[in-house]
């Protein structure tokens, strides 16, 4: 068992009730016990990822030509990278400053210079460019059209472009028209307006990158819990006694979540990571929008459970078996919100805890410490 596990493992010893195991909630003040060290943002440690301060300096340099406009977009605009209802430097989900590297990286989408129309004259040359190279060409400021057989794109007026698109939709009809939205930096507001416009035109088929990104999770959630969406909110994280991250690395993939995890840690929440590898960003993290965390860092992981790749299901079965045998299952909740409990309990009763732990790549003691 990794060293971070001692705090949680000791707190939930044999026979401890849920109430006894619950961490004490604290006021969200600065807490030295969570500090990583006295290096602002871990400068010089060589293990910090992502390095927000370096990214901020790089992005500021990229926008040196029009800093005033870039500042207006940040201070008055919405976030292109999340759905927290961001208005300027604040959002509707959590107090404090809202600023993440995802939003900064997408800033260039909103502040790009107009591209040179001459660069659109050769479609074959455009095909040879990468996505990054195409974005570097700049912002498409005017409608461009390429007809079949033409070498490249040529500029047309807004009236001609809108009339041609409208005529195509009118001739096809709403039943034979689909709207697909996917682009780097499309905001919630754009999705909302596009959906309203599609309905006004009688178009029922609206799809977006959200479905492509989350299709696997929606299928799995529907099969597992009967609902295709998550059953908790970010607000729930702030009030949770224990947050379990299974096969997830939010420090790299969902950095906005780390601010909520930091606030939860200040309130006494424990964090367990179930993953073969303990990501550096889950050992220690520096939240750039929080003075305390930016200066001293925040210890995130309290317990690391190094399951074998593919051993997640066996691990969860083993944990559930321990909870059942120790009478730590909230049967009132289970009875009100689940189906098939009796069959699951009977199946677990016939399984050997040591075999389950072995399949998960763990010792029985590690499973018991987590449970």
Tell me what each language-model feature is.
Residues 1-85:
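Intrinsically disordered, low-structural-confidence terminal and linker regions
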Residues 78-171, 285, 363, 369-370:
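Metallocofactor- and cofactor-centric catalytic cores in central/energy metabolism, strongly enriched
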């Amino acid at each position: 068992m990794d060293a971070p596990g001692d705090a949680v493992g000791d707190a939930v010893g044999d026979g401890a009730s849920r109430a006894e195991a619950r961490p004490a909630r604290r006021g969200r003040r600065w807490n030295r016990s969570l500090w990583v060290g006295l290096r602002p943002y871990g400068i010089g440690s060589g293990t910090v990822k992502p390095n927000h301060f370096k990214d901020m300096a790089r992005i500021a340099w990229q926008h040196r030509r029009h800093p005033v406009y870039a500042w207006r977009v940040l201070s008055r605009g919405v976030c292109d990278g999340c759905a927290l209802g961001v208005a300027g430097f604040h959002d509707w989900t959590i107090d404090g400053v809202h600023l993440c590297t995802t939003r900064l990286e997408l800033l260039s989408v909103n502040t790009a210079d107009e591209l040179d129309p001459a660069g659109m004259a050769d479609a074959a040359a455009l095909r040879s460019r990468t996505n990054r190279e195409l974005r570097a060409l700049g912002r498409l400021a005017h409608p461009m059209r390429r007809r079949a057989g033409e070498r490249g794109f040529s500029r047309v007026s807004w009236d001609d472009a809108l009339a041609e698109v409208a005529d195509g939709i009118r001739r096809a009809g709403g039943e034979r028209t689909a709207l697909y939205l996917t682009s780097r930096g499309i905001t919630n507001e754009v999705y909302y307006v596009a959906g309203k416009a599609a309905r006004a035109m009688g178009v029922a088929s609206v799809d977006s990158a959200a479905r492509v990104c989350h299709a696997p999770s929606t299928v799995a959630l529907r099969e597992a819990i009967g609902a295709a969406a998550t059953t908790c909110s970010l607000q729930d994280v702030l009030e949770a006694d224990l947050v379990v991250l299974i096969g997830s690395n939010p420090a790299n993939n969902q950095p906005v979540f780390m601010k909520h995890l930091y606030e939860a840690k200040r309130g006494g929440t424990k964090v367990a990571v179930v993953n073969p590898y303990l990501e550096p960003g889950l050992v220690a993290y520096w939240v750039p929008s929080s003075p305390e965390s930016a200066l001293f860092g925040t210890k995130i992981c309290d317990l690391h459970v190094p399951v074998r790749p593919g051993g997640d299901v066996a691990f969860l079965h083993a944990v559930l078996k321990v909870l059942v045998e120790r009478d730590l299952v909230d049967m009132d909740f289970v009875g009100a919100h689940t189906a098939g409990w009796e069959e699951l309990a009977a199946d677990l009763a016939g399984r050997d805890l040591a075999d389950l732990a072995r399949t998960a790549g763990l010792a029985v003691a590690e499973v018991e410490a987590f449970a």
